[in-house]
Amino acid sequence: MKLTCVLIIAVLFLTACQLTTGETYSRGEQKDHALRSTDKNSKLTRQCTPVGGYCFDHHHCCSNHCIKSIGRCVAH
């Protein structure tokens, strides 16, 4: 019985938190948050290295192929 009461109170508390958070974002703050997130992602995005460029790992190459022995991106 005590466990049931604790679970009901926890669910009500979490529901109240969700409603409060949803109300905050519906006032226009969500738009600003989305813009900040986009700016942050664009700073973290790296451009790939073209074919013939230097590479250390295949993930850096636009073609996804790096010959590590010569350190160059190659075409697939």
UniProtKB/Swiss-Prot annotation:
Propeptide, chain numbering: 23-46
Tissue specificity comment: Expressed by the venom duct.
Record key words, sorted: Disulfide bond, Knottin, Neurotoxin, Pyrrolidone carboxylic acid, Secreted, Signal, Toxin
GO CC terms, sorted: extracellular region
UniProt-annotated location(s): Secreted
Record comment regarding domains: The presence of a 'disulfide through disulfide knot' structurally defines this protein as a knottin.
UniProt signal peptide: 1-22
Pfam families according to UniProt: Conotoxin
Residue positions, PTM Pyrrolidone carboxylic acid: Q47
Cysteines engaged in disulfide bonds, as pairs: C48-C62, C55-C66, C61-C73
Family affiliation: Belongs to the conotoxin O1 superfamily.
Protein name per UniProt: Conotoxin ArMKLT2-032
Disulfide bond listed as a keyword: yes
InterPro entries xref list: Conotoxin
Gene Ontology MF: a single term: ion channel inhibitor activity
